[in-house]
C-alpha cells in the first residue's frame, strides 16, 4: 500500500493530525503572537488545522507544504474567513524558502520531511525572520529503557530544546502531549484502519493496511506508551 493512501485511511476521522488537543494548540496564538499581516509557513501541514484556524481569525498569508493529495484536498475545500493560504504539493525538501522571510515557521510531527529533527530545525530557523517564531513538534524520549534494546529512540525534551537554541532560536514555550492525548491519537488510527478493512474486504491493499496498522499499534503499546512523549517547542529567532 502506498504510504500516502495508508495515512489517508488512518487519519480519515481527525483534523488535528498530532497527539495533542485543540485547546493546547490554541496556546500557540499567544506564544507566536498571531496577528494580521503575518507570513506563516507550515511544513508537512497535512489538513492544516492550525494554520486554517489562524486564517479564519486573522489576515495572515500562509503557505502549506504537503505530500499527500488527500490531505490537501481536504484543506483546500475549507476556505479561511480572513487570511489566505496557498498549498504546495510535493516533497518539503524541494521547496526553496527565502531566508529570513517568514514570521512563523511550523513543523508539527513532520520533521522527517526535512531529513530529521536537527536538519528540520536548521532549515526552519534559516527561513524565519529575526524575532519570528520557530514551532517544532516531535516525539521525545521520556523514560530510557532499563536494558539497551538497540532501537532508535528520539532525543529527550531537554536535548531537543538544546538543538533549537544551538541553531539560533531561544525557546520561550513548550507544549507536551499527555498520555491520554497519545492514547486517543493512536486509537483513532487503529480504529479507522480496522473499520476500513471491514468495509473493504476485497480490496487488494487490505492485508497490507492491516499489517501496517498492527505494527503501528504494537509500536504505540511497546515503545511510545512506556517510553515516549510528544513535545512542541516554540523558539524565538535571535
Where are these regions (language model features)?
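Conserved alpha-helix/loop element of class I SAM-dependent methyltransferases that forms part
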Residues: 18-36
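Conserved class I S-adenosyl-L-methionine
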Residues: 37-44, 135-159
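A short SAM/SAH-binding and catalytic strip from SAM-dependent methyltransferases
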Residues: 104-117
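Class I SAM-dependent methyltransferase SAM/SAH-binding core
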Residues: 47-94
